[in-house]
Regions:
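NAD(P)-dependent Rossmann-like dehydrogenase/reductase catalytic/cofactor-binding core
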Residues: 35, 42, 91-180
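Active-site-proximal catalytic alpha-helix in oxidoreductases
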Residues: 55-99
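Inter-helical turn/loop segments and adjacent helix faces that build the functional surface
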Residues: 48-51, 82-83, 151-156
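Helix-loop-beta segment of a Rossmann-like dinucleotide-binding subdomain
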Residues: 5-25, 77-86, 124-132
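Rossmann-fold dinucleotide-binding core
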Residues: 1-62
Length: 180
């Protein structure tokens, strides 16, 4: 089976994943067809980088932490915009994103370069109007929640207590089967 993996950050045609911290854009692809995919995007005036191995995994993890942490903090504050999270709740975002990045990097066995919080916040400024909500739980925050459940089942402490508490505070229907 042939496949392509993408870590795309395009929300609007005018941002294309470009931020003040990443003027080269953030859209990233990997896999057998990554170069063909990149060519199609570039042909349409968009950016795309081909990355493999840990380099792609790190790009994917940063994107995943971005969407999960910004959405969770925003939802915790009435569904405010990404820009409001970045400007008003920045310390809360930084604490949550830091614990998620640490746990995610450990689970994926990668080292994320310093400055990731600045990169994540810069992208938020580029799409500041984007609304927040916790959606697609199984594929987004659910991945982090599963890391927590696995740790607890193994007799270890919750690696992301801020994340877990925020999920509980929102009264989300969390999958109990993951805990047992």
């Amino acid at each position: 089976m042939d496949s392509i993996g993408c870590a795309s950050t395009q929300i609007d045609s005018d941002t294309d994943g470009i931020s003040d911290a990443n003027p080269e854009g953030l859209t990233t692809a990997t896999g057998k067809w990554a170069n063909a995919f990149q060519a199609r995007l570039v042909n349409q005036g968009l950016t795309c980088h081909v990355k493999n191995g840990d380099e792609f995994t790190i790009a994917m993890l940063e994107k995943h932490v971005w969407i999960c942490a910004f959405m969770l903090v925003g939802a915790s504050h009435g569904g405010c915009t990404v820009g409001e999270v970045e400007s008003t709740y920045t310390k809360e975002f930084e604490a949550l994103a830091s614990e998620m990045m640490t746990a995610g990097a450990a689970a994926l066995n990668v080292d994320v370069a310093d400055g990731y919080l600045d990169r994540l916040k810069a992208y938020a400024r580029a799409v500041s109007h984007f609304p927040t909500a916790v959606k697609e739980f199984e594929w987004r925050n659910g991945w982090f929640y599963k890391l927590t459940c696995d740790a607890v089942k193994a007799g270890r402490e919750d690696p992301m207590p801020l994340h877990t508490q925020a999920l509980y505070d929102l009264k989300l229907p969390l999958p109990i089967a993951w805990i047992n």
